[in-house]
């Protein structure tokens, strides 16, 4: 019983420390992405959206990404831990939705030729992981994509 308690305490301590890790400095991120090219480039007549899930917490749970509504035909793809997806959008106002235990909706305005970076933050859920979508700046977006793996892309545009 004591061994089990010690193991559980050790695992929870590691998880707590992992969750408190901070992002590297902007200087370090800039140095690491200086010569980095995005896997999919922007195009002149459309916007490009990258959705990244940099955390490995709850990686067995997939976070599905939808464009403009929550219908199955609007699913653009999904991420598991440390993955990203991308898709093109027509310029204008869109709502990106991410589904885990909950729905997280984020309205974004995308211009032609612009790249928008969104992060799926992992939160503790009642049964499975919950999520929150947040907008990233260009530097942090490129940094997180550089270190991620490609998720599952259902479609590259809608």
Which stretches of residues belong to each language-model region?
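Sec-dependent bacterial lipoprotein signal peptides
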Residues: 1-22
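Short loop/turn and low-complexity linker motifs enriched in small/turn-promoting residues
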Residues: 20-158
């Amino acid at each position: 019983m004591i061994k089990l308690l010690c193991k559980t305490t050790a695992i929870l301590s590691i998880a707590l420390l992992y969750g408190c890790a901070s992002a590297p400095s902007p200087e370090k991120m800039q140095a690491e992405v200086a010569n980095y090219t995005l896997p999919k480039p922007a195009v002149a007549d459309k916007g490009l959206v990258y959705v990244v899930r940099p955390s490995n917490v709850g990686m067995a749970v997939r976070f599905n990404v939808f464009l403009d509504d929550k219908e199955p035909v609007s699913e653009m793809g999904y991420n598991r831990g440390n993955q990203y997806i991308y898709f093109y959008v027509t310029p204008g106002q869109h709502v990106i939705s991410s589904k885990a235990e909950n729905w997280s909706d984020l309205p974004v305005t995308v211009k032609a030729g612009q790249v928008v970076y969104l992060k799926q933050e992992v939160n503790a859920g009642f049964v499975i992981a919950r999520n929150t979508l947040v907008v990233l700046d260009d530097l942090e977006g490129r940094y997180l994509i550089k270190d991620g793996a490609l998720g599952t892309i259902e479609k590259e545009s809608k």
